Amino acid sequence: MTSGFLEFTVSLSAHPVTDAERESILAEPGFGKYHTDHMVSIDYIDGRGWHDARVIPYGPIQLDPSAIVLHYAQEVFEGLKAYRWADGSIVSFRPDANAARLRSSARRIAIPELPDELFIDSLCQLIAVDNAWVPRVGGEEALYLRPFIFATEPGLGVRPAKQYRYLLIASPVGAYFKGGINPVTVWVSMEYVRASPGGTGAAKFGGNYAASLLAQTEAAANGCDQVVWLDAVERRFVEEMGGMNIFFVLGSGGSARLVTPELSGSLLPGVTRASLLQLAIDAGFSVEERKIDIDEWQKKAAAGEITEVFACGTAAFITPVSRVKYGDTEFTIAGGAPGEVTMALRDTLTGIQRGTFADTHGWMARLG
């Protein structure tokens, strides 16, 4: 197979799963539990650039124990989904935005940038051999694509590596939360922070997620599904949820207003977030990006001014938030039921991604 940037070699798996095994997995995929038969690998060496692009059987990789990624976490990743349309084509939602964000993340972690064209080609190459893993038309299922770059050079000196590897793996997925579109309960972390100004919060960097795990454990211990992060300086402004951006709906009907935390440099610029802002404008809603105080959230929810809250991201898609906990405080949003604005935006975005609504912004890209 030939890319416009590099030529890909293809080595097919000698032991792919059977059709029956695959269908059994696709019937109940979970999230990230199973992987397709193949993966993409591309190497980088300083002075030579990206090279040796190949599709190979999915399996363990060999890594030196002193590889810089294992000691200094020089790694970035992305996440996007592939969908099967009724006409048989396989498409993805705004992969160009994921390619651009991977480059932005790489710059922040001193990793060489993977060209957008090569990123998109890698998706197409994997879909070409593993297209049978893309779930059936309709439903909540999709094929989750996980591209990532990590430092492979051995050495214990603290410096950017000179050798890297790009891998692309894929996993069939269902709903991110067990309850599907049922509203979730969130825990506001008052003790821990995810990121700080000037840090790595705007990069899709594994270290940010590692830093969130203790708070996520705390959330689970308090009967919550996810963590809400506050800013690192004043510890009062809502930033995002674990791996997701957050939206607040004030008012209802055609006069509803959507508010989401502004991109401060310490939260992730989500592709779904940006898309929902545009879709809200298309639907005639006013939108605002600004700081949102946790006290404002509580008071306006109690007064009935905040009528809906939802989280959004590639993995969790659009998930309503019904209940909020922190310390001895607990409150609900509008009785805890999913809101009309939330569900309308969810239906619109779902329709675009599944090919049943008009893609007026040209967001869908064919992969196979």
From Swiss-Prot:
The modification N6-(pyridoxal phosphate)lysine is found at residue 204. Pathway: Amino-acid biosynthesis; L-isoleucine biosynthesis; L-isoleucine from 2-oxobutanoate: step 4/4; Amino-acid biosynthesis; L-leucine biosynthesis; L-leucine from 3-methyl-2-oxobutanoate: step 4/4; Amino-acid biosynthesis; L-valine biosynthesis; L-valine from pyruvate: step 4/4. It catalyses: L-leucine + 2-oxoglutarate = 4-methyl-2-oxopentanoate + L-glutamate; L-isoleucine + 2-oxoglutarate = (S)-3-methyl-2-oxopentanoate + L-glutamate; L-valine + 2-oxoglutarate = 3-methyl-2-oxobutanoate + L-glutamate. It comes from the Bacteria. Disulfide bonds: none annotated. Its EC number is 2.6.1.42. Signal peptide: none annotated. Its cofactor is pyridoxal 5'-phosphate. Keywords: Amino-acid biosynthesis, Aminotransferase, Branched-chain amino acid biosynthesis, Pyridoxal phosphate, Transferase. InterPro entries: Aminotrans_IV, Aminotrans_IV_CS, Aminotransferase-like, B_amino_transII, BCAT-like_C, BCAT-like_N, BCAT_family. It is an enzyme of class 2 (transferase). The keyword Transferase applies. Acts on leucine, isoleucine and valine. This is Probable branched-chain-amino-acid aminotransferase. It comes from Mycobacterium leprae (strain TN). The lineage of its organism: Bacteria, Bacillati, Actinomycetota, Actinomycetes, Mycobacteriales. The gene is ilvE.
